[in-house]
Amino acid sequence: MVKVQSIQSQAVHAEERAHEADHPSSQVALFGADQPLRLDCGVDLAPFQIAYQTYGALNADKSNAILVCHALTGDQHVANIHPVTGKPGWWQTLVGPGKPLDPERFFIICSNVIGSCMGSTGPSSTNPLTGKPWGLDFPIITIPDMVRAQAMLIDRLGIDRLFCVVGGSMGGMQTLQWSVAYPKRVASALAIACSTRHSAQNIAFHELGRQAVMADPEWHHGRYYEEGSYPHRGLGVARMAAHITYLSDAALHRKFGRRMQDRELPTFSFDADFQVESYLRYQGSSFVERFDANSYLYLTRAMDYFDIAADHDGVLAEAFRDTTTRFCVVSFTSDWLFPTSESRNVVHALNAGGARVSFAEIETDRGHDAFLLDVPEFVDIVRAFLQSAGVAHGLAGKGH
């Protein structure tokens, strides 16, 4: 039996913005001082906690567990109503009864990554040594750190081997890291719209966002929790800039074009005359109500540092040498954040390492965010891969 606890109150922003800590809807695994998380930066993080959601039930031989890894600003609420926003889970296109990740067949786990702000320990959590929010005293974390923490959670749940690890964007990075760090614990891996290392362009976009946050006078060098302020403007601008990279020119043209917002003529001012301006402002303002600015700094930095080949003398294929994991790599034609060329590099490395891998490039103009949207071909590919992996690993037809 897994010992879990409801999320207890952690540090909240001075303006009493809603946090997962205020809505104890997740389970939490607590790890004490005797179970530290060794971070790549050399720090042992302890105590710490991981907030997570589960859907479905673990079968008798514990062979039907799927770990879903969320993206940069995602969280553990993959298929339930979000306790803060009241919106449906972020991957309802894939997770749910009759869908590819069916809780009537699989035991689905999704945890909030270390460093985030939806219940897992991060910079907005209380530093046990000071009794105050960590802020920038929180240690730098990496994608491998996130995966090590997830592995500790999977151990706590009593699961030796995962049937599948699946994720898109930063979640895809975690998926690939799982397959490298714990190859015997991952039967299959579905890596979507991602790469094995962040490009210079993506690092540049992240630096733009971080500088926007840090330039906000309300940031207070990360100590805004204690100052009774919050860097709304900086984080909002960071989100607006990032959101553009998740879309495509065709999608923006189709959705907005040059149409005016509630007017026929320009105001000859700096108001949001165009619909696309109003849309971006909404994206920025709604984001700051659910996400912590320091967490944004930490998680973007974790993505920037990610480079699987770096630990294998720069030879990516060596990271996957003789792996027994079955892979499916998916890209989207209009994704310019993680273009198909990067997915092909992953596939080539997997092939060179002797891995079993299938690859799909999906034609769509919906940009990077296509993996979060209802794209029928994508849904069909995920379903087919899980079915074939289930047959290969003796899971087909098994109940709970």
From Swiss-Prot:
Residues 1-11 have a biased composition (Polar residues). The keyword Acyltransferase applies. One of its GO terms (biological process) is homoserine metabolic process. Substrate binds at R239, D369. Keywords: Acyltransferase, Amino-acid biosynthesis, Cytoplasm, Methionine biosynthesis, Transferase. Pfam families: Abhydrolase_1. It comes from the Bacteria. Coiled coil: none annotated. Residues 64-373 form the AB hydrolase-1 domain. Residues 13-23 have a biased composition (Basic and acidic residues). Belongs to the AB hydrolase superfamily. MetX family. Transfers an acetyl group from acetyl-CoA to L-homoserine, forming acetyl-L-homoserine. This is Homoserine O-acetyltransferase. It comes from Rhodopseudomonas palustris (strain BisB18). The gene is metXA.
